């Protein structure tokens, strides 16, 4: 029934008039108002037709006699009154909606003026497209760096594994060298112990040799002293005998001469001289016997001292003992010479062994230092590789977190603009935003944005407003002097915009989370300055109009 439709339309229009309305809601209200106006006009036409029919009925018959006609007239009058009341209510609602429409139109005009006119949507779409392309480019670069970092991380893992295998091999070699060094040290200790034993034996032999030498020298000195004494006694005895023999010969010659002279002497004188000569000869013999007895006594005393010293009573045995002692002394002398030669040989061997020990010590020390240095270098390289691997893992996690955040933002935008339809889900799959279908999601978002803009343009065309004509003719709503220009963000690096030298970027690995945070904190003000700016057409490009909004 038309009245019921109009009532429902009026109710919906009244409910939609509550709250603040956007541009899309305004277009919806306009279409509802048009429908309500058409319904009101239709009701007015029906009311006029009913009034005309009623007048025609009442013209010929003021009081119809037919009760059915009277009931119909009453019913029609009631319906006319009800429709009149509804018309009044609808007119009130129409006035209220017109007032809201005018308010929304003024709000829309003010918003458009603040945003820069009818071109703001197009410029925003262009800026969004540029931003999307820039983000896609950065995402592609991030993927490239991520793949490079994964490859480099794999190479570093292989290098770390090789270094670990080399470390195990070096540790095995070091353990073998340590065992060889310990064996050499044990051999060296044994050689030192043997050398010490040889030294002790040498010292002992030298001590015994010195004792034997001292004893032999002492015995030799005693023997030589006794021998000198005996030789002196024998020489003196020999001299005494020769002197006594010479005296005896001289006396015999004198006696012979005297006997020759006695031939002329008397017998008494002969007897006297013979007696005197006999006395002299006896005296000389007695003297010689006394001297020999003294020498024998002296020899006896000397032999007695030798016998007391040696404990040997027999002279032959004493002589044999003396000869045996001489032979033993000579044998000991030869033994001492042999021992000295052996000691010299042992000293030479000890010096050679000491040289070899020192050589092995130096070699072992150099080998230990070399192995220690190599081990330290390998540990440093391993620590650096592990630190670099951890750094790459952190950067990989940061890149993954950035990719995850980007996926979440794209999914949120995808849900907000109404792209999540069954057909799209069938096309893209149910797994959501992934690295494989990221560009497909962005393409659908772009397509949906263009569709929304086209729907908006069609609604404006249906309304036939001047704003749509200006939009179609690309004419600004505001005056040229007050035109607002939206500056798109720059695609150049912030350092190039500021005239600064760009930071050196290492291409072989992605940025770490700390580096990204510091870079964002450092470049965020410049990004805000280089973002989408709204400024008047006559204002300076760098300064802008005071109070003009900045859209990111």
From Swiss-Prot:
Disruption outcome: Impaired motility and outer dynein arm defects.
Family: Belongs to the ODA1/DCC2 family.
Coiled coil: 28-59, 120-260, 331-395
GO CC term, one of those recorded: outer dynein arm
Biased composition (Gly residues): 8-22
Localization of this protein: Cytoplasm, Cytoskeleton, Cilium axoneme
Biological process (GO), any one: cilium movement involved in cell motility
Source species: Chlamydomonas reinhardtii (Chlamydomonas smithii)
Residue stretches of biased makeup (Acidic residues): 493-506
Name the UniProt record assigns to this protein: Outer dynein arm protein 1
Keywords: Cell projection, Cilium, Coiled coil, Cytoplasm, Cytoskeleton
Described purpose of this protein according to its UniProt entry: Component of the outer dynein arm complex required for assembly of the outer dynein arm-docking complex (ODA-DC) and the outer dynein arm onto the doublet microtubule.
InterPro entries: ODA-DC/CCD, ODAD1_CC
Oligomer status and interactors: Component of the outer dynein arm complex.
UniProt superkingdom: Eukaryota
Disulfide bridge map: none
Spans annotated as Disordered: 1-27, 482-515, 528-552
């Amino acid at each position: 029934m038309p009245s019921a439709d109009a009532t429902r339309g009026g109710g919906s229009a009244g409910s939609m008039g509550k709250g603040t309305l956007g541009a899309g809601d305004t277009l919806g209200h306009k279409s509802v108002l048009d429908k309500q106006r058409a319904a009101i006009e239709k009701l007015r036409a029906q009311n006029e037709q009913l009034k005309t029919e009623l007048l025609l009925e009442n013209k010929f018959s003021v009081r119809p006699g037919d009760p059915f006609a009277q009931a119909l007239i009453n019913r029609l009058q009631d319906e006319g009154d009800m429709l009149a009341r509804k018309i009044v209510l609808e007119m009130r609602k129409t006035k209220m909606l017109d007032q809201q429409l005018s308010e929304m139109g003024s709000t829309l005009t003010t918003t458009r003026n603040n945003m820069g006119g009818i071109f703001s949507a197009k410029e925003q779409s262009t800026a969004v497209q540029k931003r999307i392309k820039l983000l896609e480019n950065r995402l592609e670069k991030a993927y490239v760096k991520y793949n490079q970092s994964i490859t480099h991380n794999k190479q570093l893992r292989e290098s770390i594994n090789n270094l670990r295998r080399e470390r195990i091999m070096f540790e095995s070699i070091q353990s073998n060298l340590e065992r060889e060094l310990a064996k050499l040290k044990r051999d060296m200790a044994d050689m030192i112990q043997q050398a010490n034993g040889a030294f002790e034996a040498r010292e002992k032999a030298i001590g015994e040799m010195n004792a034997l030498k001292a004893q032999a020298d002492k015995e030799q000195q005693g023997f030589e002293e006794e021998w000198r004494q005996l030789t002196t006694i024998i020489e003196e005895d020999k001299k005494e005998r020769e002197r006594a023999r010479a005296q005896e010969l001289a006396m015999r010659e004198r006696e012979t001469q005297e006997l020759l002279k006695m031939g002329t002497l008397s017998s008494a004188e002969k007897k006297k001289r013979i007696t005197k000569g006999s006395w002299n000869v006896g005296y000389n013999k007695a003297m010689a016997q006394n001297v020999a007895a003294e020498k024998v006594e002296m020899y006896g005393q000397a032999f007695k001292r030798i016998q007391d010293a040696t404990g040997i009573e027999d002279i032959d045995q004493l002589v044999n003992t003396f000869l045996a002692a001489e032979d033993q002394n000579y044998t000991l002398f030869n033994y001492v010479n042999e021992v000295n030669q052996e000691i010299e040989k042992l000293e030479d061997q000890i010096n050679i062994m000491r040289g070899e020990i020192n050589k092995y010590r130096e070699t072992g020390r150099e080998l230990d230092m070399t192995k220690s240095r190599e081990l330290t270098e390998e540990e440093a390289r391993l620590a650096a590789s592990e630190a670099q691997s951890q750094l790459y893992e952190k950067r990989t996690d940061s890149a993954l977190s950035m990719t995850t955040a980007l996926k979440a933002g794209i999914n949120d935008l995808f849900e907000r603009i109404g792209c999540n339809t069954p057909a799209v889900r069938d096309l893209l799959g149910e797994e959501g935003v992934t690295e494989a279908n990221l560009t497909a999601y962005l393409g659908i978002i772009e397509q949906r944005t263009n569709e929304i803009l086209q729907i908006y343009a069609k609604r404006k065309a249906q309304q036939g407003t001047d704003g749509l004509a200006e939009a179609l003719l690309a004419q600004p709503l505001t005056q040229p002097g007050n035109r607002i220009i939206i500056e798109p963000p720059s695609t150049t690096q912030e350092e190039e915009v500021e005239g600064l030298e760009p930071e050196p970027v290492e291409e072989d690995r992605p940025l770490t989370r700390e580096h990204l945070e510091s870079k964002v904190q450092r470049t965020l003000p410049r990004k805000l300055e280089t973002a989408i700016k709204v400024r008047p057409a006559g204002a300076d490009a760098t300064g802008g109009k005071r109070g003009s909004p900045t859209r990111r």
